[in-house]
């Protein structure tokens, strides 16, 4: 049995071996309660540990996030955001029109809000940089700063020197060596969102090589 206590941001559990769980989980304590025998801080780390142990702990974002923006998230978007916050890498293969963009931005915002990441790079088709991504950031994350890294080489490098929360670039721009190196040199971009994964289905392209070098700098 598991429940969420929202005011205290805690998970309440009834488990057969609460002492062992307590030894594995930081910020937890055994309870003398008729329904629950363990309280755990509802953090991302605790949720992952519990899930690895077979306990169906919900993602913290579902209960401890204000979901900012002009509209409320749909149930499917909450599921998307939960998945994205719980996994270091993943694909969202939902159909068109399911508002994947907003779900990804909410997930990124929650991760920033809770100090799991610092800044985000969005790699997306040129036609979507402003019309889709920048527009959606303004719609759902009005408190965040975002900039489009497009134009001359010098302009791109200047944009990357600016203090933004989201840097939005197209695959061709990422393939410019000096631009990619400037992104890596920042040292504070901890999350990369890649739009249109089909762009990278051919490993022999410059776009694929550039993204691989960014995600695996040792190559």
Regions found by a protein language model. Give the residues of each.
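The Walker A (P-loop) glycine that initiates the GxxxxGKT/S ATP-binding motif of P-loop NTPases
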Residues: 94
């Amino acid at each position: 049995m598991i429940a969420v206590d929202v005011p205290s941001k805690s998970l309440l559990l009834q488990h057969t071996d609460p002492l062992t769980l307590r030894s594995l989980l930081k910020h937890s304590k055994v309870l003398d309660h008729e329904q629950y025998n363990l309280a755990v801080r509802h953090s991302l780390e605790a949720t992952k540990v519990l899930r690895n142990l077979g306990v169906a702990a919900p993602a913290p974002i579902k209960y401890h996030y204000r979901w900012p923006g002009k509209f409320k998230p749909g149930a499917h978007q909450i599921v998307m955001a939960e998945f994205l916050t719980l996994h270091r890498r993943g694909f969202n293969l939902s159909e068109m029109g399911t508002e994947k963009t907003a779900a990804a931005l909410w997930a990124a915002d929650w991760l920033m809000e809770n100090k799991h990441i610092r800044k985000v790079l969005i790699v997306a088709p040129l036609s979507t940089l402003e019309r889709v991504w920048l527009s959606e950031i303004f719609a759902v994350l009005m408190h965040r700063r975002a900039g489009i890294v497009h134009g001359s080489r010098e302009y791109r490098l200047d944009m990357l020197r600016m203090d933004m929360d989201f840097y939005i670039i197209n695959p061709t721009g990422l393939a410019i060596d000096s631009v990619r190196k400037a992104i890596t040199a920042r040292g504070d971009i901890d999350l990369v969102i890649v739009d249109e994964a089909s762009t990278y289905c051919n490993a022999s392209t410059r776009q694929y090589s550039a993204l691989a070098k960014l995600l695996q700098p040792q190559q």
